[in-house]
């Protein structure tokens, strides 16, 4: 109940060291909750180069495909661990690298759903991670239309890894088009971004 039919947002899952901390209000780790949400949303990606996929990022980003025929098998076959820093820009670099390998822009997700405790590495020249990401996409040859409509959903799993201020940073100054902030544990809350009906 409350699930979306499909989404063109690919899940970007933070597996940095701080994700091993408990998520606020639960006995579960941010790592496990992010894994569950990643599995939930990747089931809804349309067919194509990114179907059944998710992106892991810590100090670097990697593309993964779930292995198995059931959610349980996919969960148990995922051997990722929490380690390293939270290099959000490595996700954008991965997008750019894939494009350079010849994948057509029309096959790319229209945005990312980043599940993290939001302790991103700082960017250079005091730019926000969002601004730096869009700049990199443009430089990699993505069309103006693609970049201007690229959605960045930052889903914060509040932890206390660095104390009470963990995950309370914003990556924008004021309202920015196609950038959304969420928190919590119910995947249906992003249905309005997908154009899908809820059930």
PLM region spans:
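Acidic, glycine-rich A-domain
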Residues: 1-199
């Amino acid at each position: 109940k409350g699930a979306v039919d499909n989404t063109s947002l690919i899940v970007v899952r933070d597996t940095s060291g701080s994700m091993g901390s408990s998520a606020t209000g639960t006995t579960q780790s941010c790592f496990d909750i992010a894994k569950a949400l990643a599995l939930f949303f990747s089931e809804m990606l349309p067919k194509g180069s990114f179907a059944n996929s998710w992106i892991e990022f810590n100090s670097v980003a990697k593309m993964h495909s779930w292995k198995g025929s059931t959610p349980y098998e996919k969960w148990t076959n995922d051997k990722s661990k929490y380690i390293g820093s939270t290099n959000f820009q490595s996700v954008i670099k991965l997008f750019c690298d894939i494009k350079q390998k010849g994948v057509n822009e029309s096959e790319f997700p229209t945005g990312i759903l980043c599940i993290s405790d939001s302790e991103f590495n700082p960017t250079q020249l005091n730019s926000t991670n969002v601004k730096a990401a869009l700049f990199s996409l443009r430089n990699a040859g993505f069309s103006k239309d693609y970049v201007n409509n690229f959605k960045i959903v930052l889903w914060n799993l509040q932890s206390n890894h660095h104390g009470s201020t963990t995950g309370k940073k914003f990556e924008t100054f004021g309202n920015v088009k196609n950038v959304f902030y969420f928190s919590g544990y119910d995947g249906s809350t992003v249905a309005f971004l997908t154009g899908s009906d809820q059930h």
